[in-house]
């Protein structure tokens, strides 16, 4: 995701590999603390202690706490933008592509549950120009889902539907795995949750030939979700 250079986070350290490693370490600690005690009450000192680094080291990689929150949220969106296209690469059938896209979205949310919850709670805490960038990033991700839905309707595999609204129903469903994880975790595995979601949010809108196509889509998580390369 190319978020305007004017909004990039400056680092004193110039080694890209070291910057990536240290920022990952610091962001992981910050995500935990922001989720547990809130963005405003968390201090740089607390983040440093959680990450087992000095406050001085943090300031070599981030200018301030807003930088840390921004990169935390940006990382989630980057992962969506990387994983969804990767999961549907090489797939030609619209129904199969849509199912894989939903799976990919939910799998990323599952892997980054704390950060997903944090995005809902704390995007408003970013300065205004960065809030716009985060919203733009989410919109780009959502368009990938919407495009998959549109391909299904255009191909006659799904009846005419408000593609924009259905897209957001799917997005909200994926996010709910993190936001309401406490309510779902004792009832469903991730695989069961996504399977039920496909039955609720995709299958009812399919035409006869769309249902035939969906019946051929693998149901297991192992078959649907491709391991990172």
Swiss-Prot record:
The HTH tetR-type domain sits at: 20-80
- DNA-binding region in chain numbering: 43-62
Q: Does the keyword DNA-binding apply?
A: yes
Keywords of the record = Activator, DNA-binding, Repressor, Transcription, Transcription regulation
For this protein, the activity regulation entry reads: Activity is regulated by the effector molecules 3-hydroxybenzoyl-CoA and benzoyl-CoA, which bind to HbdR, alleviating its repression on the three target promoters and inducing the expression of the hbd genes.
Matches recorded under InterPro entries: DNA-bd_HTH_TetR-type_CS, Homeodomain-like_sf, HTH-type_TetR-like_transc_reg, HTH_TetR, KstR2_TetR_C, Tet_transcr_reg_TetR-rel_C_sf
Listed GO molecular functions?
DNA-binding transcription factor activity; transcription cis-regulatory region binding
A Pfam family of the record is TetR_C_24
- Report quaternary structure and partners: Homodimer in solution.
Record function comment = Transcriptional regulator that controls the expression of the hbd cluster, which contains three catabolic operons and is responsible for the anaerobic degradation of 3-hydroxybenzoate. HbdR suppresses the activity of the three catabolic promoters (PhbdN, PhbdE and PhbdH) by binding to a conserved palindromic operator box. In addition, it slightly increases activity of its own promoter (PhbdR). The HbdR-mediated repression of hbd genes may play a crucial biological role in maintaining requisite hydroxybenzoate levels in the cell.
Descriptive protein name = HTH-type transcriptional regulator HbdR
Per the record, the gene is: hbdR
């Amino acid at each position: 995701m190319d978020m305007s250079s004017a909004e990039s986070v400056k680092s004193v350290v110039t080694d890209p590999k070291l910057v990536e490693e240290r920022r990952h370490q610091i962001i992981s600690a910050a995500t935990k603390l922001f989720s547990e005690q809130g963005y405003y009450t968390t201090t740089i000192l607390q983040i440093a202690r959680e990450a087992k680094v000095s406050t001085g080291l943090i300031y070599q990689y981030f200018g301030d706490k807003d930088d840390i929150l921004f990169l935390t949220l940006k990382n989630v969106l980057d992962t969506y933008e990387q994983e969804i296209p990767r999961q549907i690469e090489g797939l030609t059938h619209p129904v199969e592509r849509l199912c894989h896209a939903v799976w990919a979205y939910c799998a990323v949310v599952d892997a980054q549950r704390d950060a997903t919850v944090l995005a809902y709670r704390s995007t408003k805490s970013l300065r205004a120009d960065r809030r716009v960038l985060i919203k733009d990033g989410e919109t780009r991700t959502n368009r990938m889902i919407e495009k998959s839905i549109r391909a299904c309707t255009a191909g006659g595999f799904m009846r005419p539907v408000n593609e924009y609204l259905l897209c957001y129903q799917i997005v909200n469903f994926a996010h709910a795995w993190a936001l309401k994880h406490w309510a779902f975790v004792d009832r469903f595995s991730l695989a069961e949750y996504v399977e039920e979601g496909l039955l609720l949010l995709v299958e009812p809108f399919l035409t006869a030939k769309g249902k035939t196509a969906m019946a051929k889509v693998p149901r297991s998580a192992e078959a649907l979700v491709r391991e990172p390369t």
